[in-house]
Amino acid sequence: MKIAILSQDPKLYSTRRLREAAENRHHDVQVINFMRCYMNITSHQPFVIYQGQRLENFDAIIPRIGASATFYGTAVVRQFEVMGGFSANTSQAISRSRDKLRSLQILARKGIGLPVTGFAHATQDIDGLIETVGGAPVVIKLLEGTQGIGVVLAETHQAAKSVIEAFRGLDANILVQEYIAEAKGTDIRCFVVGEKVVAAMKRQGAEGEFRSNLHRGGKADKVRLTPEERSTAVRAAKAMGLRVAGVDLLRSNHGPLVMEINSSPGLEGIEKTTGVDVAGKIIEYLEKNAAPGKTTDRIQY
């Protein structure tokens, strides 16, 4: 197959591993900085230009699009879909997953377990907002935050009020969630490919840190999932329309709860922790689902 990896940095671990896995299986692979592409969107024969050359006849696309590049990145993915390329994640699913509020609303509608969550912008009834999720302690998040940035644990009602007031001064949209104390600062990253969890790890926050992000000094270990946890991760990815996803779960007293779904999950932490060839699993999935030579429009509006 002819595969395009859409990535701004070919030296990133995830990009390198995907390229290596594809080449090991004898595919023709090209890493493309999607931010440097331009497109003809009105042509009867739509195309993408990169480094002065038309990008044509790709059987499969692997988007590795960071949060800050979502708008243009998904536009490029959409153009490849119009040209008939099979994307590991569709442009629509990526856009949907990048909106944290919309993601939670979709998951709630599908009956998937979530922490009790409130959403606000400039409410004057801060006390009511806090009580809506069961009172302190609560976790307060900036809607646009990533990698644990803009996430605060408020252990008392007064602390929660102070944080919400401060965020309100930033003219920010905020999520307020119940704090799952029994999780003890750990979460579980489930890596879903297709309709299967191919690898999973438990992440523990650094000393005195309730956020478990590896970017923030957390550590990771292999973990055995329960059937309910596997089912929840797969159902969550499917609800979002994601074929490749990192689903973050908390273990609560009333079952697994979904914290977040990532449409461009990193491979380094999960591969080094579990020893699973996750990049290879993604390429295998493309082999089974991307029909070489298919040129019909795959776009979903």
Curated annotation (Swiss-Prot):
<dbReference type="InterPro" id="IPR023533">
    <property type="entry name" value="RimK"/>
</dbReference>
<feature type="domain" description="ATP-grasp">
    <location>
        <begin position="104"/>
        <end position="287"/>
    </location>
</feature>
<dbReference type="InterPro" id="IPR004666">
    <property type="entry name" value="Rp_bS6_RimK/Lys_biosynth_LsyX"/>
</dbReference>
<keyword id="KW-0479">Metal-binding</keyword>
<feature type="binding site">
    <location>
        <begin position="178"/>
        <end position="179"/>
    </location>
    <ligand>
        <name>ATP</name>
    </ligand>
</feature>
<dbReference type="GO" id="GO:0018169">
    <property type="term" value="F:ribosomal S6-glutamic acid ligase activity"/>
</dbReference>
<dbReference type="GO" id="GO:0005524">
    <property type="term" value="F:ATP binding"/>
</dbReference>
<feature type="binding site">
    <location>
        <position position="260"/>
    </location>
    <ligand>
        <name>Mn(2+) 1</name>
    </ligand>
</feature>
<dbReference type="Pfam" id="PF08443">
    <property type="entry name" value="RimK"/>
</dbReference>
<keyword id="KW-0460">Magnesium</keyword>
<feature type="binding site">
    <location>
        <position position="187"/>
    </location>
    <ligand>
        <name>ATP</name>
    </ligand>
</feature>
<dbReference type="GO" id="GO:0036211">
    <property type="term" value="P:protein modification process"/>
</dbReference>
<dbReference type="GO" id="GO:0046872">
    <property type="term" value="F:metal ion binding"/>
</dbReference>
<dbReference type="InterPro" id="IPR013815">
    <property type="entry name" value="ATP_grasp_subdomain_1"/>
</dbReference>
<keyword id="KW-0547">Nucleotide-binding</keyword>
<feature type="binding site">
    <location>
        <position position="262"/>
    </location>
    <ligand>
        <name>Mg(2+) 2</name>
    </ligand>
</feature>
<keyword id="KW-0648">Protein biosynthesis</keyword>
<dbReference type="Pfam" id="PF18030">
    <property type="entry name" value="Rimk_N"/>
</dbReference>
<dbReference type="InterPro" id="IPR011761">
    <property type="entry name" value="ATP-grasp"/>
</dbReference>
<dbReference type="InterPro" id="IPR041107">
    <property type="entry name" value="Rimk_N"/>
</dbReference>
<feature type="binding site">
    <location>
        <begin position="211"/>
        <end position="213"/>
    </location>
    <ligand>
        <name>ATP</name>
    </ligand>
</feature>
<dbReference type="GO" id="GO:0006412">
    <property type="term" value="P:translation"/>
</dbReference>
<feature type="binding site">
    <location>
        <position position="260"/>
    </location>
    <ligand>
        <name>Mg(2+) 1</name>
    </ligand>
</feature>
<keyword id="KW-0464">Manganese</keyword>
<feature type="binding site">
    <location>
        <position position="141"/>
    </location>
    <ligand>
        <name>ATP</name>
    </ligand>
</feature>
<feature type="binding site">
    <location>
        <position position="248"/>
    </location>
    <ligand>
        <name>Mg(2+) 1</name>
    </ligand>
</feature>
<comment type="similarity">
    <text>Belongs to the RimK family.</text>
</comment>
<feature type="binding site">
    <location>
        <position position="260"/>
    </location>
    <ligand>
        <name>Mn(2+) 2</name>
    </ligand>
</feature>
<dbReference type="GO" id="GO:0005737">
    <property type="term" value="C:cytoplasm"/>
</dbReference>
<feature type="binding site">
    <location>
        <position position="248"/>
    </location>
    <ligand>
        <name>Mn(2+) 1</name>
    </ligand>
</feature>
<keyword id="KW-0436">Ligase</keyword>
<dbReference type="GO" id="GO:0009432">
    <property type="term" value="P:SOS response"/>
</dbReference>
<feature type="binding site">
    <location>
        <position position="260"/>
    </location>
    <ligand>
        <name>Mg(2+) 2</name>
    </ligand>
</feature>
<keyword id="KW-0067">ATP-binding</keyword>
<protein>
    <recommendedName>
        <fullName>Probable alpha-L-glutamate ligase</fullName>
        <ecNumber>6.3.2.-</ecNumber>
    </recommendedName>
</protein>
<feature type="binding site">
    <location>
        <position position="262"/>
    </location>
    <ligand>
        <name>Mn(2+) 2</name>
    </ligand>
</feature>
<dbReference type="InterPro" id="IPR013651">
    <property type="entry name" value="ATP-grasp_RimK-type"/>
</dbReference>
